[in-house]
Amino acid sequence: MTDLPSSGPRPGEPLSRVGHRLLLVHAHPDDESINNGATMAKYAAEGARVTLVTCTLGEEGEVIPPSLAHLAPDRDDTLGPYRVDELAGAMKELGVTDHRFLGGAGRYRDSGMMGVEQNERPGAFWSADVDEAAAHLVRVVREVRPQVLVTYDPDGGYGHPDHIQAHRVAMRAAGLAADPAFRPDLGEPWDIAKVYWNRVPRGVVLEGFERLRRDLAEPGRVPFRQAASVTDVPGVVDDHLVTTEIDGTGFAAAKAAAMRAHATQIEVAEPYFALSNALAQPLLSTEYYELVRGRREGGSRESDLFEGIPGISFEERQNGTAL
């Protein structure tokens, strides 16, 4: 965890970014890099405090490299600790220094896909009490005091139980953190100004897959044999539902490097990637969101998650008068 720096803004750092605090809640290691890697790298580079909370260690993931197959849950069951290290590598690539696991590393276990027996095993995140899990996140919210929260939609983007549960826990914690009557021992109340869900506009996905199909038709151009489908992309919605578009083209390399750090789960061949199913899909450097709580300035798409939220002056930071 890193405090706000005490020196002046770095060259090129917009003054308004100083004092901005972004909290992201994800289900497993790798979700943050796939969904928000460019966003995280951009805001971290611009001087915002970026905090990631990951809810499980991703113990039930499928392992891609044959040399690491022994990590799988049906063999050594050591994938979780290995993915902790992968996540640390990804955070380094994104320039993010504040990462926590919900309730501490290993407090909640990956639940596996919907309908499998792992959903109900002791400690599975899917079977956790939402208020109990949310209390762990309330502690983080009241400590970090983020103006912006990013998480999944109610379906978790694609129906994975841990993603759905992460949504429930994040939204519940956002409400409880602002309630002065809830657990005063967890810190002073804090009301998050803006809450976003991860989204991808259908038009962008269709365009990306059309480009992918053309590239697949040229032998040797793409190292993957087959394309995924639009339904394999989490959070795809009609274009009009997207309220916010973060241009991360300047951080595309950082996002790709962070995804590569999750080598047990992702294969990257820019501008495409594949998961354990080996089905290629576009790697997007521009990332999209739907504002579900908070004020939106004007009717056009936002280009900044902190739009309408002032930063703090350098003098305030030096004097210690800012939160």
Curated annotation (Swiss-Prot):
Domain of life where this protein originates: Bacteria
UniProt: Zn(2+) binding residues: H28, D31, H163
Known EC number: 3.5.1.103
Pfam families documented for this protein: PIG-L (PF02585)
Keywords: Hydrolase, Metal-binding, Zinc
One term of GO molecular function: zinc ion binding
Catalytic reaction annotation: 1D-myo-inositol 2-acetamido-2-deoxy-alpha-D-glucopyranoside + H2O = 1D-myo-inositol 2-amino-2-deoxy-alpha-D-glucopyranoside + acetate
Cofactor(s) annotated in UniProt: Zn(2+)
Coiled coil: none
CC cofactor note: Binds 1 zinc ion per subunit.
GO BP terms, alphabetized: mycothiol biosynthetic process
Family: Belongs to the MshB deacetylase family.
HAMAP family for the chain: MshB
Role description: Catalyzes the deacetylation of 1D-myo-inositol 2-acetamido-2-deoxy-alpha-D-glucopyranoside (GlcNAc-Ins) in the mycothiol biosynthesis pathway.
Name of the protein in its database record: 1D-myo-inositol 2-acetamido-2-deoxy-alpha-D-glucopyranoside deacetylase
Organism from which the protein derives: Streptomyces scabiei (strain 87.22)
